[in-house]
Amino acid sequence: MVESKLMIADRSFASRLIMGTGGASNLAVLQEALVASGTELTTVAIRRVDAEGGTGLLDLLNRLGITPLPNTAGCRSAAEAVLTAQLAREALATNWVKLEVIADERTLLPDAIELVRAAEQLVDDGFVVLPYTNDDPVLARRLEDTGCAAVMPLGSPIGTGLGITNPHNIEMIVASAGVPVVLDAGIGTASDAALAMELGCDALLLATAVTRAADPAAMAAAMSAAVTAGYLARCAGRIPKRFWAQASSPTLVTTQSPGAESGN
């Protein structure tokens, strides 16, 4: 039986698509995209949001019944990320955090050393930690061993739209993981989303692919459909790849000479 719900820690979600909020031109556009996506969990960069609701973003998520997932976007050290997560816990009354510790502004790739340090401290402090990490199976396993509730490997660098540049590594992460694997970053279009699920990911997190699309709401709907299609295809079991062609139906028809039926 296909397990339709996504389980992270002690919570279940009907949608396997997690949305980000960065890049939207305005809140009205963001609202249309969020509704079209069907998401139930959406990241919020705590350093860019007025926790009192001044930006309207938190109010919007509340109206839509979407759970905000604070993240530590922009942090460059473990100490900075831990402090940001603690502030988010106080402001939003949640111990869930998407952990980001970025090495530099040009690549926006995770700093593996600082990421693990931050994860260890936050887990010890009672957080449900979802770390944005490189597509490195060893690092993903290390983060799981620290007690992270999921691992979130990148498909390609944030905002590039390059899709999944190392699918084999994603498959290795999935094969070794004992926690949900959420592909995070680099998605460009719906086919990338479907591939992520076919590779074995439990969920997908994206923002730019939707918020900067020509029609964000339409792209959000496409991403939602692609995530569902990719997940169902994986559960259904694809046929094995073959070098040579194979007829879908055996050849059983026999031929006979004209007039055979009449006995002539």
Curated annotation (Swiss-Prot):
Record GO cellular component, one term: cytoplasm
Subcellular location: Cytoplasm
Record's keyword annotation contains NAD: no
Active site: residue positions: K98 (schiff-base intermediate with dxp)
Pathway(s) annotated for this protein in UniProt: Cofactor biosynthesis; thiamine diphosphate biosynthesis
Enzyme class: transferase
Gene Ontology BP term (one): thiamine diphosphate biosynthetic process
Catalyzed reaction equations: [ThiS sulfur-carrier protein]-C-terminal-Gly-aminoethanethioate + 2-iminoacetate + 1-deoxy-D-xylulose 5-phosphate = [ThiS sulfur-carrier protein]-C-terminal Gly-Gly + 2-[(2R,5Z)-2-carboxy-4-methylthiazol-5(2H)-ylidene]ethyl phosphate + 2 H2O + H(+)
EC number of this enzyme: 2.8.1.10
Annotated binding of 1-deoxy-D-xylulose 5-phosphate, by residue: G159, A185, G186, A207, T208
One function term, GO molecular function aspect: thiazole synthase activity
Keywords: Cytoplasm, Schiff base, Thiamine biosynthesis, Transferase
Protein family: Belongs to the ThiG family.
Subunit comment: Homotetramer. Forms heterodimers with either ThiH or ThiS.
Function: Catalyzes the rearrangement of 1-deoxy-D-xylulose 5-phosphate (DXP) to produce the thiazole phosphate moiety of thiamine. Sulfur is provided by the thiocarboxylate moiety of the carrier protein ThiS. In vitro, sulfur can be provided by H(2)S.
Record's protein name: Thiazole synthase
Protein source organism: Mycobacterium ulcerans (strain Agy99)
